[in-house]
Amino acid sequence: MKYFEVGGQEVVTSVLAVRFTKQGHNIVIVSFNPPARLMKERLPEDIPFYVLDGFHYSRKNIKMIRNILEKHRIKVVINQWGLPYLPILVLRKACGKQNIKIVSVYHNDPGTNARLKIVEEQIKQVAGKWCKIILKIKWHIFRIATGVSMHYVYNYSDRYMLLSQSFVSSFKRFAYLTKNDKVQILPNPITIPSSDFIFDFLQKRKEVLYVGRIDENQKRIHRIIDTWALLEASFPDWKLIIVGDGVEKRNLVGKVIQLKLNNVVFEGFQNPSLYYKRASILMLTSEYEGFGLVVVEAMSFGVIPVVYGSYSAVYDIISDGVDGVILPYNKKGYDTEFATEKMKELMLDADKRNNLAQAAIITSKRYSVESIVDSWNKLFAKL
């Protein structure tokens, strides 16, 4: 991994590492850069954690990885960052002639990424003709570079894992592949235990919840605030709870103040279990996602997901109107008024919330840690 920061990818890595260790696997985690303290503290002391000499190709990194592979007799490497070529380049050199299998995982929609989205937003915002042309050229350069990088990673991996079957065609096209026989489909597991949770609709509060990074490029939380601004006056007994932090928090707080919203609460980074147990609705309005781990985690606690359909994997998870609500993707942009109407339907209808919440719990069981780890073990056996 490049980093081991506070994020879904890192949490999934931690949960899988702990479970694999309990099953007797010899697990080691390696990061190019130092980990976030909060994430490192989540790991048991019996799981070795190594930090390399920064994210670059160097003899020192190659030697460090080679020593780790030999010391711990590693047979399989899971590359949790399946986009950049550099980790695979360093790993291949470190492996030498050792028969070590590589499984690369891409944790997002393979048809886009943060760099491309930034340029797309810039294209929308600039007025000058030549500025748009230059930005479009920049976009195509990024697009080609990303595709070539993913192509390299795929070629030198024994398996390339995507989170949804719906991503296969876009991945094949994006990475300039003629075949995709090494692609493996496996979603992420629910990382927060909910087996002891007993659903009681009467214990659910009138709370709408967001859990995750406060990040504008991907998460677009301002959409939730805009929707809430149209709801708050009509639902004074409801609250919007935002659990998470990030670079855009100050701007988001400023927006809440500007709109004079009274029932919006910022909780910062917290263990979301308590919030899942009591919340009624989860909103996720990202511009792109890979899987949206918070969706299935919330569902396991009977929280109804209302999710913007900007990524195809959400249709694998949610049956619209049965165990959650999907807000259809709109090429012209997120439809705040439509989202508001859908939220009103839920907030006004307790019976509907009760039914959808119970159905969501049933759906979430497909993504249990036990089920996903079992699939991983079957993959290991085939390598």
Residues covered by each model-derived region:
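Nucleotide-activated donor-binding/catalytic signature segment of Leloir-type glycosyltransferases, i.e.
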Residues: 48, 251-269
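Aromatic "clamp/platform" in nucleotide-sugar-dependent glycosyltransferases that forms part
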Residues: 287
